[in-house]
């Protein structure tokens, strides 16, 4: 059975007595940090930041990494495109304010990468996001293999150990 409350989602582990401990992601779990200003125009009729803005914040942070040639070398005939985006909304964000987006690569494949991100307001995680990003050949509009130097650079933004040596390649899911 799924948990009815999205606020309970996050990283879980068992304590020695078998009970569940909720451990949400921390900004320190992500090698890339991006700050975005929340605008009045970002609010919805409920007075909080619109869910579409969560996706825009993730996109801006993704592009800060993927479109910066000092970080990620790119072939001139290719570009990154998003193939999938999932967002788990864990809490509200409000204007005025700042949101910090933590980003990392969790897997680098032949022509794509899996990126996970989290949005933080005042140290509290408001959302987790996972995206699949594909390198596309501009001429054929089809997936293209990642060049070795691009793969190597992307791996530099992969998940750091979480303290016990395990990679942070999880994706929080509700229990069944």
Describe the role of every protein-language-model region.
Residues 2-102, 106-176:
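Terminal targeting signals and extreme-terminal segments of soluble enzymes
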């Amino acid at each position: 059975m799924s948990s009815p409350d999205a606020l309970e989602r996050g990283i879980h582990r068992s304590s020695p007595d078998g009970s569940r401990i909720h451990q949400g992601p921390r900004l320190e779990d992500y090698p890339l940090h991006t700050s975005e200003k929340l605008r009045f125009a970002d609010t919805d009729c409920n007075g909080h930041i619109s869910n579409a803005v969560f996706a825009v914040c993730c996109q801006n942070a993704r592009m800060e990494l993927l479109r910066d040639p000092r970080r990620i070398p790119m072939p001139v005939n290719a570009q990154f495109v998003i193939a999938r985006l999932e967002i788990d909304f864990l809490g509200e964000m409000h204007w005025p304010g700042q949101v910090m987006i933590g980003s990392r690569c969790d897997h680098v494949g032949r022509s794509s990468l899996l990126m996970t991100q989290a949005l933080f307001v005042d140290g509290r995680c408001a959302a987790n996001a996972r995206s699949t990003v594909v390198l596309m050949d501009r001429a054929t509009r089809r997936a293209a293999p990642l060049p070795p130097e691009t793969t190597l650079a992307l791996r530099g933004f992969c998940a750091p150990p979480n303290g016990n040596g395990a990679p942070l390649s999880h994706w929080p899911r509700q229990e069944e």
